[in-house]
Amino acid sequence: MSELKTVGLFALTALAEIAGCYLPYLWLREGKSVWLLIPGALSLIAFVWLLSLHPTAAGRVYAAYGGVYISMVILWLWTVNGIRPTTWDIVGSAIALLGMAIIMFAPRSA
């Protein structure tokens, strides 16, 4: 799988997980409709399915996915919650993405 497809799949996976957790949060903490649990559960099902599409060892996928997840949550904080990321949020996200790139794309012996 190409690097661009891998990162895109990680981003889509992260969005599914974030939405799957955020929708029940809205119900529990902000008094929104209980019906949000249905798309929340579907999002978590999609998250698990998307995570299974990555073509490398599960442990490596989970470790690398964490870097993309961090960056996607910071983006969610800004776009959905309306909270502008700090310089340190952005630096931390960049470091996490660098870690993801090293884990996923470093040369490996066959």
From Swiss-Prot:
The chain crosses the membrane at residues 7-27, 33-53, 63-83, 87-107. It comes from the Bacteria. It is found in: Cell inner membrane. GO terms for cellular component: plasma membrane. The keyword Transmembrane applies. Keywords: Cell inner membrane, Cell membrane, Membrane, Transmembrane, Transmembrane helix. It holds the Pfam family UPF0060. It is a multi-pass membrane protein. The keyword ATP-binding does not apply. Its main location: membrane. PANTHER family: UPF0060 MEMBRANE PROTEIN YNFA (PTHR36116:SF1). Belongs to the UPF0060 family. This is UPF0060 membrane protein Pcryo_1498. It comes from Psychrobacter cryohalolentis (strain ATCC BAA-1226 / DSM 17306 / VKM B-2378 / K5).
